[in-house]
Amino acid sequence: MALGDKNQGSSKSQAKQKGTKGKNAQPRLKSNQLKRLKINEELKELQSRVDNFVPPSEITLFSELPMSSKTQKGLKSSHFLNPTPIQSLAIPPALQARDILGSAKTGSGKTLAFLIPLLERLYLEKWGPMDGLGAVVISPTRELAVQTFMQLRDIGKYHNFSAGLVIGGKPLKEEQERLGRMNILIATPGRLLQHLDSTVGFDSSAVKVLVLDEADRLLDLGFLPALKAIVSHFSPVQTAPGSRPSRQTLLFSATQSKDLAALAKLSLYEPLYISCNKPGEEGVMPANLEQYYAVVPLERKLDALWGFVKSHLKMKGIVFVTSGKQVRFIFETFRRLHPGLPLMHLHGKQKQPTRLDIFQRFSSSKSALLICTDVAARGLDFPAVDWVIQLDCPDDVDTYIHRVGRTARYQSAGTALTILCPSEEEGMKTRWGEKAIEVKRIKIKEGKMGNLKQSMQNFAFKEPEIKYLGQRAFISYMKSVHIQKDKSIFKIDALPAEAFAESMGLPGAPQIKLGNQKAAKVRGPSKEELARKAEKEEEEEEERAVVGSDEESEEDESEGLGSEDEEEEIDDEAEEIDDEEESGEESGSDEETEEEKDASKPKAPAVRTKYDRMFERKNQSILTPHYTALIAHDADNAAGAGEADDDDDVFTLARRDHNLSDDEEADTDAILGAEALAAELKKPLITSEDLSKRKLKAAASKKGLLKSRPGPEKVLFDEETGEAREFYKSGVDVEKEMSAADKRREYLEKEREIMKIQDKIDKEVAREKKKELKRKRKERERELRQMEMGDEPVAYLGGDDDYASADEGRSLSPSPAPSLEPERHAKKQRRGGVQESGAGDLEDEEALALRLLQGS
């Protein structure tokens, strides 16, 4: 009954619950809808926290900031717990969609100060894969863009955004296919502008966050027109009053300049100025940085650097020089000297995979030396850099600040050393004083400096490539000093050019024409200059040879316009124009008449096809026309402008007026015609001038050289005399000697004689072995017979010592091997079950044992 009542009561309660559900219950929701509602509630709560957030006086943890759980989780997994001063000041207003213009010392964490607001803004906007591009970060160099991308990937790995890297050095078509799927884009300005202008379907009107990293460097590289064009593609900043701006702009830099104000007016809307420096100390140095400078003559700078490297073999350092030509020259020469420290080099002319590989290898190395240009001076965070050596004087104090900022990052210690020429000391000290930067002077002892003069001369003498690199490095350094604006520091007349060239292993200073090339780095060559250069290349082969070979390499490597490569390419163009003008003057351009000048007026450049570019290819090694032009300059200076070159092996014959008869003249003409025809036939049908650069490279490769070289010769050495003789002989020598059948017969006879001698020796050895075995068998039989007869064994001491010593242990004991009769007899006795034993046998055995013991 109780069980029935219980069941009845439960059924009633279930019916009651069903009735209530049918009247008051809400409709059932799917899991996706619940998840969406939960996300919306979290976003509303986060937005209210951001709007109502009042930053405290000091923020010590990232968890105190109003950020999403995904960003907090990414920061914690990357071990970012405590914000730096610039981060604690810039992140709270940036989270509220304010435009920021921030300035802080190098290594203070400016990258996180704009990456965190970028992620939070897109997260609050519910940005998804179908929304397109939402944030853009513009960096001045490729390496800095790669570093920013890696940092974004670490802290944003828990978000669902797609990020991409668009820099030079990669095919444009591959990047165009991926642009439509990117939410966050990190790019260099040149390549980004190229995509904005040419990529079909690339919509950038919905960008919510624009970041300009190292903005002053972007302006120094002449990217202001490109930045104006890029900003024009994005959505406008101003919106309705009281609402959130449609686009937020964050601008960060380590130094402030006048041009930043123009850029701020262009892209920022009511910006908030944030600076972690004290008033009047913009660009102040890190507290843990020790700064020194040394005054060294120009011709001893390489000696000072070599001595420093040899005395710091366990350090991790960066050496800054002015141009990529100097980087290559120092790297190639120091590499051949084997300093005992890993050497790496980085400059703007390298291919992008090579630059990334060097960047990663140097970052992961504990001790290494990186020789580089200013391409690595901005924003790159190399861990644990101990020394920064500036072998060349920096352009200005801002460049100095960014160079030395590669060490002493955040709270780590570092040391900076600047090597100045005597003429640069006073001007640089004045500029340091204006920025309140204290740099101590040190003196390098003579014993600590190296002596590379003889080694450099040997390298230049043995390897023409090193000599060519030295000439280009010398020219690029002198031109970089010439185009500097601050003439109180850079005085080209005070530099010892001849001594500097001699220290680089050169026989003399190369000829340089320093024309009035104002603002050459900014504007590049004009259209008239390019047209004049094309006209001269078509007219004279000599002038075409003077033009440098770097033009083709620049065309291949300058796919990415937004990088440090642009500045170096413009420098090389200006250098080629100077060389061309110099060669034009040497070839007699001063003697042109008015008619020739009118005829050589620049024409409108025609369309260049791929076949035109194919015929314009030039060598890029020591066979470059520019290198031959440098050699020609030296020869002209030595022999005079009007004299012929000594290297020419062609004799010029002057015709004399002799009284010749008609027959003699006819004979002479016939002889001369035959000689000319023979000389013409001796000439090759195809010369190197008729081949393309690809064919010349293939001929210079290992495979091509092996084809042109003669085959290897096999040499045999006589076993008796040791004399070498050829394995293969010519047909005449073979005919003089005996035939092949006679040689085989002679060889077989010699081998038969040798085999007969060996057979005799083998037979004698076999005969001796048989005799010895027979003798040993007879000895054992004799011993056994004596033991059976009861006599004492006889020890034979004569004969061979080897056999006596070998049988010494067993000569006194019976061996069962020679005869099996005792064993058979014993077996028969055991088989019969009766074994005769008696006192006589036992006594005999005891006596035998006693005799054996006494005999032994």
UniProtKB/Swiss-Prot annotation:
GO terms, molecular function: ATP binding; ATP hydrolysis activity; identical protein binding; RNA binding; RNA helicase activity
Region described as Disordered: 1-34, 509-612, 768-856
Motif Q motif, chain ranges: 60-88
Domain annotation Helicase ATP-binding: ranges: 91-274
Ranges for domain Helicase C-terminal: 288-460
InterPro entries, alphabetized: DEAD/DEAH_box_helicase_dom (IPR011545), Helicase_ATP-bd (IPR014001), Helicase_C-like (IPR001650), P-loop_NTPase (IPR027417), RNA-helicase_DEAD-box_CS (IPR000629), RNA_helicase_DEAD_Q_motif (IPR014014), SPB4-like_CTE (IPR025313)
Polar residues bias: start-end ranges: 7-17
Top-rank taxon, per record: Eukaryota
Pfam family membership, one: CTE_SPB4
Reactions mediated catalytically: ATP + H2O = ADP + phosphate + H(+)
Residues the entry annotates as binding ATP: A104, K105, T106, G107, S108, G109, K110, T111
Keyword vocabulary terms for this entry: ATP-binding, Helicase, Hydrolase, Nucleotide-binding, Nucleus, Ribosome biogenesis, RNA-binding, rRNA processing
Sequence motif: DEAD box, positions: 213-216
GO biological process, one term: rRNA processing
Residue spans of biased composition, Basic and acidic residues class: 525-536
Low complexity: compositionally biased ranges: 811-820
Major place of residence: nucleus
PROSITE patterns, per the entry: DEAD_ATP_HELICASE, HELICASE_ATP_BIND_1, HELICASE_CTER, Q_MOTIF
Biased composition, class Acidic residues, residue ranges: 537-597
PANTHER family: RNA HELICASE
Entry note about domains: The Q motif is unique to and characteristic of the DEAD box family of RNA helicases and controls ATP binding and hydrolysis.
Record function comment: ATP-dependent RNA helicase required for ribosome biogenesis. Involved in the release of U14 snoRNA in pre-ribosomal complexes. Required for pre-rRNA cleavage at site A2.
Family statement: Belongs to the DEAD box helicase family. DDX10/DBP4 subfamily.
Name assigned to this protein: ATP-dependent RNA helicase DBP4
Lineage of the organism: Eukaryota, Fungi, Dikarya, Basidiomycota, Agaricomycotina
Gene name of the record: DBP4
